[in-house]
Regions:
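Active-site beta->alpha N-cap acidic-glycine motif
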Residues: 1-61, 69, 73-83, 122, ...
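Alpha-helical scaffolding segments of alpha/beta enzyme cores, especially the outer helices
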Residues: 14-17, 40, 44, 72, ...
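Structural preference for beta-strand elements that scaffold enzyme active sites
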Residues: 25-27, 51-53, 91, 113-114, ...
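C-terminal domain-boundary segment and adjacent tail
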Residues: 36, 161-190
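A short acidic, helix-capping loop that chelates divalent metal ions and anchors anionic groups
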Residues: 60-65, 153-157
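His/Asp/Glu-enriched short active-site or ligand-binding loop at hydrolase and phosphoryl-transfer sites
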Residues: 98, 103-139, 179-189
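Active-site glycine- and acidic-residue-rich loops that bind
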Residues: 121-130, 155-165
Length: 190
């Protein structure tokens, strides 16, 4: 499980309770501006053993940024997340997943690996809990990286209540089917 655009209360808090109850680890791709506003959530995520990764300093389309702007965003975002979490940040998912070879090169120069997803239920559109769950189940495969959202761009945050409710159902269904949940770095090492 991966979560983008947070941390953002109350959704990240609710999500952490579910993950802790079910003893599931996840990877949180954070917008560093959101992390700065909610350092207590970053600390809580790290303390619970989840992986923290960079989504961006600001939630902007990297393909529309100059190389200098990309570098500045990545370096600042990484620095903020490492300071707040105490973790070494090694992964980044550019906003919207938009990337090209220049973006990938900039990430690599900053010690980061680009990560996208393989299951995308489009939860940010709030299609309903059952639709989110059904879309995940339809796309699911061993080694899947599931993209969900616990926040949104710093300027606007839609409700993530449907996502939070869907996470409980997803975890229970997938555990019943014999799936295990690991962080992205753990998955990459397998």
């Amino acid at each position: 499980l991966t979560f983008d655009d947070g941390p953002y209360p109350p959704y990240t808090d609710e999500l952490l309770k579910i993950l802790e109850q079910r003893q599931v680890k996840a990877t949180f791709f954070m917008v560093a501006e959101n992390a700065e506003k909610h350092p207590e959530l970053v600390a809580k995520i790290a303390a619970q053993g989840h992986e923290i990764a960079l989504h961006a300093l600001k939630h902007r389309d990297f393909l529309k940024l100059s190389l200098a702007e990309q570098q500045k965003d990545i370096a600042a975002g990484k620095r903020i997340l490492e300071k707040l979490s105490g973790q070494k940040i090694t992964l980044m998912r550019p906003p919207h997943g938009f990337r090209d070879w220049a973006v990938i090169d900039t990430l690599q120069k900053n010690g980061l690996t680009a990560v996208n997803w393989s299951v995308i239920p489009r939860d940010w559109t709030n299609p309903g809990v059952s639709v989110i769950v059904d879309r995940i189940m339809e796309q699911l495969h061993p080694g899947a990286i599931i993209l969900l959202h616990d926040g949104d761009s710093p300027k606007y945050v839609a409700s993530r209540e449907e996502t939070i409710q869907a996470v409980s159902v997803i975890i229970d269904k997938l555990c019943a089917e014999g799936y295990n949940f690991v962080t992205v770095n753990e998955l990459m090492q397998k």
